[in-house]
Amino acid sequence: MRYYYGQLTKPLQGVYDTLLSGFRVYAPSIRIPDVEQGQLAEVYLRLKLDEPLLFYVTGYRCRWMPGAAHLELLPEYLFDKSKIRTHQQAVEARLSRLTRPLQGKPELEQELAIHDFILEQVRYDKLKKPYSHEILGPLTQGVGVCEGIAKTVKALCDRLGLWCIVALSEAAPERGIRYRHTWNVLRIGGQYYHLDATFDNSLQRGVKRYDYCNLDDSRCFRDHESLVFPIPACPDSRAFYYRNVSFTKPEELEKRLAQALRKKQPVFVFHWRGGGLNRQILSELLALAGTLAQARGKQASCSVNVPQAVIQLQFSDAPEPDITIQQANEGEAAPETQTVSE
């Protein structure tokens, strides 16, 4: 689905089409109209966001002829033609194998299956190898960074006919965000939602997390920076994953915690919307959990995603640190400690 293509002017759409045709046949050079370098860079970036199957294109150089009305673009490929074809076959086989069982399923079920594939089968590549920025990393190597993960989500959605785009945000060095970040926007049940599988991947500790599954704009941009390109508005919150375990009062949490402990669940994850998550509130909630856990011979501890107000309670036989503050963007942010206000 060529979402970013539709935001270009007609002349730049022509450049986009020419690049796409050339990349698909591994052309060593592509002749295009002489456009400004900034415009060309934007067209290339939009194309790469729209077309995750172009995993083998890593950049380009340009060559100009004096007085000519065109320029020659020289693509940079990750592999030679033979290796590209081999990797394309592997990617195609993997996409087919992953999506075949999901054909005809409800949109939400398809989305959650894709999300869970990322959490179960892909680990964040802190070395940031070149293929980790493309679908090749998550699909064939089991590693990826945010760009490769978001493109993989889109490739799987495209195969299923599920509306999906890759969202791209700016870096914010002054706040310790060293790199641009990518995630996805999906259309589920006619509504647009944010899905950040990379952040959820970073948060999981013994249980899959869905803190960034189907967020509206207000929640997403609590810890995502401003966008590079416009995306659809996401005002709806009805598909938020933790909607049914979103509490405003301690007594609501107490009832559900008691049920979880009776069922001997080692972990309980919930969303808190009963006011700002400061240390006093966290201590009160942890004390409540601790009292219930002690009645069953357990100790309670918690991990907290402060911006999204999602809390993971752990019940164990041995004492653990009371409160652990989690940072979802650990791969893209400069090392720093997230704090909870008093």
Which ranges hold each PLM region?
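Structured segments of extracytoplasmic/periplasmic soluble domains
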Residues: 46, 50, 94-101, 117-121, ...
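Metal-dependent nuclease catalytic core centered on acidic motifs
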Residues: 212-300
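Solvent-exposed loop/turn segments at secondary-structure junctions
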Residues: 79, 121-125, 146, 171-175, ...
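Short coil/turn segments at secondary-structure boundaries
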Residues: 58-61, 127-134, 272
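Hydrophobic/aromatic-rich core segments of domains that either
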Residues: 148-220
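An N-terminal amphipathic alpha-helical segment
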Residues: 1-26, 124-125, 238-273, 332
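Linear, non-domain "peripheral" regions
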Residues: 1-94, 262, 278-342
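Secondary-structure boundary elements
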Residues: 77-138
